[in-house]
Amino acid sequence: MKYIDEAIIHVIAGKGGDGVAAFRREKYIPKGGPSGGDGGRGGSIYAMADRNINTLVDYRFARIHRAKNGENGQGSDRYGKSAHDIVLRMPVGTVITNEATGERVADLVQHDQKILLAKGGTGGLGNLHFKSSTNRTPRQFTLGEPGEEADLKLELKVLADVGLLGMPNAGKSTLIRAISAARPKVADYPFTTMHPALGVVRVDQNRSFVMADIPGLIEGAAEGAGLGHRFLKHLARTRLLLHVVDIAPLDEAIDPVYEAKAILEELRKYDEALYRKPRWLVLNKVDLLPENEREKICKKFIRSLRWKDKNFAISAMTGDGCKELTYAIMEFLERESMDENQERATFAEPDTSD
């Protein structure tokens, strides 16, 4: 299935049914009172998060979603039938924005989360509501109200704890295959990964985290070059970024330090908030370096890059260093969660001082 992470849809809620002016016409009651019923409610349109859906492809090709109108009221006090609501199922992680105003309508972050997109119109009133002591035969009734209508932008941002970024062929897909059950395509040519891949990394029976792999970045990505710029938004929700670098490129003309700096610059130009996220350096393919020179080459690279944060030397192909990396990630995420919980508890603690 083609991966689609953006779509624009037009939603039209149903109009409320009209009320009606009618009178009782029964044998032996020549002047019956008003009996016009109300119109039914128009159908509303909802969005619901569904963890079994992972693309917005259905909404790229079916753009208009219209709920039915409520039925009109009838005589003999019969109310019009309300229309059924429509529920649009979308992937967890979908952000919904009003195209006209730019206002965020919803952020679907939990399975079965349900949000109203367009409210159906209220049904009109029949003439039985207008009877009074001075007006026994009212002919007034009201029309049903129109339903809400809007153009909405749908944007999927995957929910992951950890995001991988790096140049094409840095070994990101091999890494996520090595430590999770995800099976992205792996090959010896650039841009093998064409869309985000998610993998659940299980550290032990009770602990796990979700990792996201996106297409590799190239220089100029922030201005639209390559594929990765389209998918950088999928790293927005992550709590930790892993900058994966091919420390042993087969092409001697490639400078890993230059490429690593280029990635950091693209990240900074794309989104300052994303650039400021916690970020670790992962030097991949150390198995291709001479064993007696690995440590020296890695240290030289870190000095040249002026890297101050955490770094790991691994081989995603052989698994060397991967276990240590996954445990370090899990510990970091657990500390982050504890700190967040403490902050919330401190914020919520009532002030008992006089």
Curated annotation (Swiss-Prot):
<feature type="binding site">
    <location>
        <begin position="191"/>
        <end position="195"/>
    </location>
    <ligand>
        <name>GTP</name>
    </ligand>
</feature>
<feature type="domain" description="OBG-type G">
    <location>
        <begin position="160"/>
        <end position="334"/>
    </location>
</feature>
<dbReference type="GO" id="GO:0005525">
    <property type="term" value="F:GTP binding"/>
</dbReference>
<feature type="binding site">
    <location>
        <begin position="315"/>
        <end position="317"/>
    </location>
    <ligand>
        <name>GTP</name>
    </ligand>
</feature>
<dbReference type="GO" id="GO:0000287">
    <property type="term" value="F:magnesium ion binding"/>
</dbReference>
<keyword id="KW-0460">Magnesium</keyword>
<comment type="function">
    <text>An essential GTPase which binds GTP, GDP and possibly (p)ppGpp with moderate affinity, with high nucleotide exchange rates and a fairly low GTP hydrolysis rate. Plays a role in control of the cell cycle, stress response, ribosome biogenesis and in those bacteria that undergo differentiation, in morphogenesis control.</text>
</comment>
<feature type="binding site">
    <location>
        <begin position="284"/>
        <end position="287"/>
    </location>
    <ligand>
        <name>GTP</name>
    </ligand>
</feature>
<dbReference type="GO" id="GO:0003924">
    <property type="term" value="F:GTPase activity"/>
</dbReference>
<keyword id="KW-0342">GTP-binding</keyword>
<dbReference type="Pfam" id="PF01018">
    <property type="entry name" value="GTP1_OBG"/>
</dbReference>
<dbReference type="InterPro" id="IPR036726">
    <property type="entry name" value="GTP1_OBG_dom_sf"/>
</dbReference>
<dbReference type="InterPro" id="IPR006169">
    <property type="entry name" value="GTP1_OBG_dom"/>
</dbReference>
<dbReference type="InterPro" id="IPR006074">
    <property type="entry name" value="GTP1-OBG_CS"/>
</dbReference>
<feature type="binding site">
    <location>
        <position position="173"/>
    </location>
    <ligand>
        <name>Mg(2+)</name>
    </ligand>
</feature>
<keyword id="KW-0963">Cytoplasm</keyword>
<feature type="binding site">
    <location>
        <begin position="213"/>
        <end position="216"/>
    </location>
    <ligand>
        <name>GTP</name>
    </ligand>
</feature>
<protein>
    <recommendedName>
        <fullName>GTPase Obg</fullName>
        <ecNumber>3.6.5.-</ecNumber>
    </recommendedName>
</protein>
<feature type="binding site">
    <location>
        <begin position="166"/>
        <end position="173"/>
    </location>
    <ligand>
        <name>GTP</name>
    </ligand>
</feature>
<keyword id="KW-0378">Hydrolase</keyword>
<dbReference type="GO" id="GO:0042254">
    <property type="term" value="P:ribosome biogenesis"/>
</dbReference>
<dbReference type="InterPro" id="IPR031167">
    <property type="entry name" value="G_OBG"/>
</dbReference>
<comment type="subunit">
    <text>Monomer.</text>
</comment>
<feature type="domain" description="Obg">
    <location>
        <begin position="1"/>
        <end position="159"/>
    </location>
</feature>
<keyword id="KW-0547">Nucleotide-binding</keyword>
<feature type="binding site">
    <location>
        <position position="193"/>
    </location>
    <ligand>
        <name>Mg(2+)</name>
    </ligand>
</feature>
<dbReference type="GO" id="GO:0005737">
    <property type="term" value="C:cytoplasm"/>
</dbReference>
<dbReference type="InterPro" id="IPR027417">
    <property type="entry name" value="P-loop_NTPase"/>
</dbReference>
<dbReference type="Pfam" id="PF01926">
    <property type="entry name" value="MMR_HSR1"/>
</dbReference>
<dbReference type="InterPro" id="IPR045086">
    <property type="entry name" value="OBG_GTPase"/>
</dbReference>
<comment type="similarity">
    <text>Belongs to the TRAFAC class OBG-HflX-like GTPase superfamily. OBG GTPase family.</text>
</comment>
<dbReference type="InterPro" id="IPR006073">
    <property type="entry name" value="GTP-bd"/>
</dbReference>
<keyword id="KW-0479">Metal-binding</keyword>
<dbReference type="InterPro" id="IPR014100">
    <property type="entry name" value="GTP-bd_Obg/CgtA"/>
</dbReference>
